[in-house]
From Swiss-Prot:
NCBIfam families in alphabetical order: rplT_bact
Protein's recorded name: Large ribosomal subunit protein bL20
Highest classification ranks of the organism: Bacteria, Pseudomonadati, Thermodesulfobacteriota, Desulfovibrionia, Desulfovibrionales
A GO MF term: structural constituent of ribosome
Organism: Solidesulfovibrio magneticus (strain ATCC 700980 / DSM 13731 / RS-1)
UniProtKB keywords: Ribonucleoprotein, Ribosomal protein, RNA-binding, rRNA-binding
CDD domains: Ribosomal_L20
C-alpha cells in the first residue's frame, strides 16, 4: 500500500515557518531557508542560556566592585570581609543593594572595614 505523507510534511513545514516568523524575505517564506535559520536560532538560544548565567555574574561582580571602591575597599577585600563577618548574601543580592540601597551597602562596607582592620 502506498504511504501518503502530505499531512506530515505540511505540519512540519508549518512548524518551521511559524518559528521563522519575523525574519525578512526568503528566511520566513521558503521552507528550506526557514528551517536552517530556525534551527540555528535554537542553537543560539541554547548557547546563550548558558552564557547569560556567566554574564550576569560578571555584571554583579562589576557592580559590587564599583560600590565597594566608593567605600574605599577593593572587591576581593570586601568579599573576604563579608566571609569573615559571617554575612551570607550572594552576589546577586549584593549587586542589587549596591544599586538600589546604597545606605545598606555602606553599612555593610563599614562592617567589613571593622572586621578586616
Amino acid at each position: 500500500m502506498r504511504v501518503k505523507r502530505g499531512q506530515a510534511a505540511h505540519k512540519r513545514h508549518k512548524k518551521f515557518l511559524k518559528m521563522a516568523k519575523g525574519y525578512v524575505g526568503a528566511r520566513s517564506k521558503l521552507y528550506e531557508t526557514a528551517r536552517e535559520v530556525a534551527e540555528r536560532s535554537l542553537v543560539y538560544a541554547y548557547r546563550d542560556r548558558k552564557q547569560r548565567k556567566r554574564q550576569m555574574r560578571k555584571l554583579w561582580i562589576l557592580r559590587i566592585n564599583a560600590a565597594a571602591r566608593e567605600n574605599g575597599l577593593s572587591y576581593s577585600v570586601f568579599m573576604h570581609g563579608l566571609t569573615v563577618a559571617g554575612v551570607e548574601l550572594d552576589r546577586k543580592v549584593l549587586a542589587d543593594m549596591a544599586v538600589r540601597e546604597k545606605d545598606s551597602f555602606q553599612k555593610l562596607a563599614e562592617l567589613v572595614k571593622s572586621k578586616v582592620a
